[in-house]
Amino acid sequence: MKGQETRGFQSEVKQLLHLMIHSLYSNKEIFLRELISNASDAADKLRFRALSTPELYAGDGDLRVRVSTDKEKRTLTISDNGIGMSRDEVIDNLGTIAKSGTKSFLESMGSDQVKDSQLIGQFGVGFYSAFIVADKVTVRTRAAGANADQGVYWESAGEGDYTIADITKDDRGTEITLHLREGEDEFLDDWRVRSVISKYSDHIALPVEIESQTESEEEGGESTVSWEKINKAQALWTRSKSEVSDDEYNEFYKHISHDFTDPLSWSHNRVEGKQEYTSLLYIPAHAPWDMWNRDHKHGLKLYVQRVFIMDDAEQFMPNYLRFVRGLIDSNDLPLNVSREILQDSRVTQNLRNALTKRVLQMLDKLAKDDAEKYQTFWQQFGLVLKEGPAEDGSNREAIAKLLRFATTQSDSSAQTVSLEDYVSRMVEGQDKIYYITADSYAAAKSSPHLELFRKKGIEVLLLSERIDEWMMSYLTEFDGKSFQSVSKADDTLDKLADEENDAQKEAQKALEPFVERVKTLLGERVKDVRFTYRLTDTPAIVVTDADEMSTQMAKLFAAAGQQAPEVKYIFELNPEHALIKRAADVSDEAEFGEWVELLLDQALLAERGTLDDPNLFIRRMNQLLSA
């Protein structure tokens, strides 16, 4: 070979190469993705330059990438008939770590040309990923438009230097041969290579072909070599929505999600302007088995100009939308040099915000257009969506529109009522959205806190899932109306009761000494004792003050193993109930104490579902019943 010389890399050489090869990439098979991406770039460069210089094609305009293996020599070769490189370009692009010929090419192009390009290899470490699986890499290349004797040979063992020489190469383009390390024979296997290409390069517009040998049927005959196209899947998301059928969208969803059922809905959009990207987002019909596994990553597939970069790119979707499947394809995304971890930047955040709004709009449309499908969605993913009000304050109102509830108006635990439905049915003079949280639907439905609301025909949301209390601590209002827990102390609730008549006033006045006796007996165990007119069938209830931690929130703390502050209840008494009147007539202090304790335990049991000493409660009840 003529002009042979050995040169040192123009960077931090051996140390940097070693760091990159062994640490930069988390998945060694992506070397093939990187090399095919580089080949795709080379084809794009030739296509652009041939627009003004068609003779660069030299009669070979069918651009492609070819992959072949040699099991005897233990080599894997990736070749293309793209733009190729001159000697200076080889030194410049392959002799410098983190130097990208693609990036330089982009900078030399006009903005309109950049917009239409499909260049993907914008980071100069991609080529060197070959050393993850190879202990020696050789490159044979010839620039388009150059003579056959102007080919270039490059070789390196990834040890800090490389050899370069002049060669004769009959055709343009680049041929990269990897001499595989011991233990990397899997990349000599035809099926393994095919699967990697299908996984990472399925949607490159450039054909990716693999060598296929057919044995001769004649004895002693030579086998024939042909090239089989591997990347059969189309870049569906680059096509116009009007050109894609529902069946194609459904099949593509199954392809990228490995799901067997059709999605409930999808949204396909191309955005142009300051940021340009295409998104294709799907709402699955059922929850994945690992949706609640916090260690499992959830997110969109990330493509850069149709080349797969990573699964589960979490940066583009908030956690409460982790059920969304799909992809985003852009050339403007900020990536670190390995393309493995997206940089935390304004561009990424803007994309996240836009995609989040897109999903919320898609769900809103699904709810309006197909209530049955939306109910399927809610049954599968409602619990996840309920994380939204706490996680995403900027979209809280939009998320609230998507929530569904069981209510006192329906005799079913099915969560089918929207907040818009609730507001449309509010009675005259009602200015709050009332709700109750409990351990179960049955407990919520039968709570004594609902007695006044049933009497007045006021609908109450029945919340019975563990996340509900936490969600409601962030969901403070909807459509200008505040939320009010019916288990919290609220002066306006008594105003909902009938105006006190003279008889009620007299009854309350007569029982005022009773209230004082109860206060004296219970002391610091309760925050206050007072009458209420929101009860009809129940003698007493306990409520928490407006600024006090609720019973359900205290249970959440306890379930999480955290120490919650002790809840001090307000003990509210129904002055018109027979048991209250009977207790008030008891003069014996010991018996009076038993009555008060029984009434308090009943109220606590209704509120909390448990008592500190249920056996004492039973003995006390039996004693009073047998008296």
UniProtKB/Swiss-Prot annotation:
GO CC entries: cytoplasm
Keywords: ATP-binding, Chaperone, Cytoplasm, Nucleotide-binding, Stress response
Name of the molecule in the record: Chaperone protein HtpG
The protein's role, per its UniProt record: Molecular chaperone. Has ATPase activity.
Main location: cytoplasm
Subcellular location as annotated: Cytoplasm
Family: Belongs to the heat shock protein 90 family.
Region annotation C: where it falls in the sequence: 556-627
Region (A) residue spans: 1-339
Gene: htpG
Family matches, as InterPro entries: HATPase_C_sf (IPR036890), Heat_shock_protein_90_CS (IPR019805), HSP90_C (IPR037196), Hsp90_fam (IPR001404), Hsp90_N (IPR020575), Ribosomal_Su5_D2-typ_SF (IPR020568)
Gene Ontology molecular function: ATP binding; ATP hydrolysis activity; ATP-dependent protein folding chaperone; unfolded protein binding
Disulphide-bridged cysteine pairs: none
Region annotation (B) ranges: 340-555
Matching SUPFAM superfamilies: ATPase domain of HSP90 chaperone/DNA topoisomerase II/histidine kinase, HSP90 C-terminal domain, Ribosomal protein S5 domain 2-like
Assembly, per entry: Homodimer.
One Pfam family here: HATPase_c_3
